[in-house]
């Protein structure tokens, strides 16, 4: 089994340490971080809002590399944020926010998005983790999408880290998933007949003007328009860097398993789009706190579905020598709950102040 390359992008909020509101200081933080000798110029990037920043690891071959880069980048950004009077926050949505959004980053594409959908952009203050896995060619990439799409609701549930919005509990474990689902091309990707079918359908979306560039394909998994990768985008950003490492290992193993199954002629399990969409909504609503709906439409315990996932990707994890690390982190997740669960426990202890204390503390790398 080939060892596929992997890279991770993480988006963070910047919070005012006094008010805990999103703080529009991205330009200053990025400038300060760029002065650090251990941060590359392309590794720290702007995001839609001036209260957000994004980091991108180099292309890696091991989870140790991914973890080292994420810790390094969180450390650099954390120092830069503190030097500019704010704090780094690895949460999918801001627990507290003002009615008016932070300023938009000065970028022509972002301005075009605001003109296209003003209210959606105003509420797009969300942060995710994106995992890129290298694939040999786009045709194989489409075959991968057809197979991993069935597992995206499980990843949504596992990564849930956005229960609060504008000072209240949304009732969802991943409110970020709901926010992203309002865009015209979003949620789990459809099944494609082949690469030509994929290209035809994307071109139709561009031609009719529903999207104005491939970057607006907000499917939860897609072919990257910039890199020779499959990009999984359904994950909320993680409180802890090692949980992002866990997801990098899981996603790479899903891609490797999909490639091997496609080459072996293993049939793609069927799943009606409405069932997959419903399973995705259910995962965003409940996280791992109860049941999940699998791609056969069965309501099962979250633990059983995670066990099925680990069995499915087990050989790929073994081949990459990732089994022990990923299994240990999955067991911790089941024991402690999702970041959304942990945020809610903090709320019971000390209100929203305790929630943001948890987020700031866990996001920091000391």
Curated annotation (Swiss-Prot):
It comes from the Bacteria. It catalyses: L-cysteine + L-glutamate + ATP = gamma-L-glutamyl-L-cysteine + ADP + phosphate + H(+). Signal peptide: none annotated. Its EC number is 6.3.2.2. GO terms for molecular function: ATP binding; glutamate-cysteine ligase activity. Keywords: ATP-binding, Ligase, Nucleotide-binding. InterPro entries: GCL_type2/YbdK_subfam (IPR050141), GCS2 (IPR006336), Gln_synth/guanido_kin_cat_dom (IPR014746), YbdK (IPR011793). It is an enzyme of class 6 (ligase). ATP-dependent carboxylate-amine ligase which exhibits weak glutamate--cysteine ligase activity. Belongs to the glutamate--cysteine ligase type 2 family. YbdK subfamily. HAMAP family: Glu_cys_ligase_2 (MF_01609). This is Putative glutamate--cysteine ligase 2-2. It comes from Streptomyces avermitilis (strain ATCC 31267 / DSM 46492 / JCM 5070 / NBRC 14893 / NCIMB 12804 / NRRL 8165 / MA-4680). The lineage of its organism: Bacteria, Bacillati, Actinomycetota, Actinomycetes, Kitasatosporales.
């Amino acid at each position: 089994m080939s060892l596929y390359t992997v890279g991770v992008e993480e988006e963070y909020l910047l919070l005012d340490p006094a008010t805990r509101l999103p703080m529009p200081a991205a330009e200053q933080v990025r400038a300060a971080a760029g002065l650090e000798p251990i941060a590359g110029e392309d590794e720290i990037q702007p995001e839609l809002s001036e209260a957000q920043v994004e980091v991108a690891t180099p292309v890696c071959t091991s989870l140790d590399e991914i973890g080292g880069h994420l810790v390094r980048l969180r450390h650099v950004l954390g120092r830069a944020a503190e030097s500019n009077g704010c704090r780094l926050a690895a949460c999918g949505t801001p627990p507290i926010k003002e009615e008016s959004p932070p300023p938009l980053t000065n970028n022509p594409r972002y301005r075009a998005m605001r003109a296209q959908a003003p209210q959606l952009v105003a509420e797009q203050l969300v942060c995710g983790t994106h995992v890129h896995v290298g694939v040999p060619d786009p045709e194989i990439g489409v075959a991968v999408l057809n197979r991993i799409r069935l597992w995206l609701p499980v990843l949504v549930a596992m990564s849930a880290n956005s229960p609060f919005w504008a000072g209240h509990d949304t009732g969802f474990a991943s409110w970020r998933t709901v926010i992203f689902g309002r865009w015209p091309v979003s949620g789990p990707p459809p099944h494609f007949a082949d690469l030509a079918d994929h290209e035809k359908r994307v071109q139709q979306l561009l031609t009719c003007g529903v999207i104005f560039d491939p970057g607006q394909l907000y499917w939860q998994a897609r072919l990257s328009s910039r890199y020779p990768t499959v990009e999984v985008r359904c994950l909320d950003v993680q409180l802890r860097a090692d949980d992002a490492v866990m997801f990098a290992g899981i996603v790479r193993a899903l891609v490797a398993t999909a490639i091997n199954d496609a080459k072996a002629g293993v049939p793609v399990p069927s799943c009606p789009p409405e069932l997959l969409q419903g399973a995705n909504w259910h995962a965003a609503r409940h996280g791992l706190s109860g049941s999940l709906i699998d791609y056969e439409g069965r309501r099962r315990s979250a633990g059983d579905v995670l066990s099925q996932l680990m069995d499915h990707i087990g050989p790929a994890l073994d081949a990459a020598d990732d089994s022990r690390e990923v299994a240990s982190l999955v067991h911790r997740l089941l024991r402690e709950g999702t970041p959304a669960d942990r945020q809610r426990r903090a709320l019971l202890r000390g209100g929203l102040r305790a929630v943001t204390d948890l987020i700031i503390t866990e996001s920091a790398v000391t």
